[in-house]
Amino acid sequence: MPKYLLLKHYSGGPEPHHPFPPLDQWAPEDVEAHFAFLRNVGEVLRESGEYVDSQALTPAQTWVRYGGPDAAPVTTDGPLPETTDLVAGWYMVDVDSRERALEIAAYISSEPGPGGGPLHEWIDVREIMSHAPVAD
């Protein structure tokens, strides 16, 4: 069965979605409802045997790249003002088909936001490579 990484994007995606304030500005009951929904998604996926893992991510980030053979790694802390995207978390699922991964992603996108309405967050659906690509 193929595995997929479902990346939850707080902002970004192919087109703008409904703007919401950052999570730390939500009412406590909205935060609890949001995370209760996400915990329930994990429980449902465990029961179906499709759950591999999931994590929420903090907004703080550090970018790093190779600095060269005799140089330290180059790092930049963020989030950066010019960065328009923030990955808020992810689920990894092991499913029968891409269609099932899309179905799960669409459901996750309905997670409640401020006031209880759906966030309509973009979910980036990426298949996990099962083997290295072969050059022609």
Predicted region positions:
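Conserved, structured core segments of small domains
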Residues: 1-136
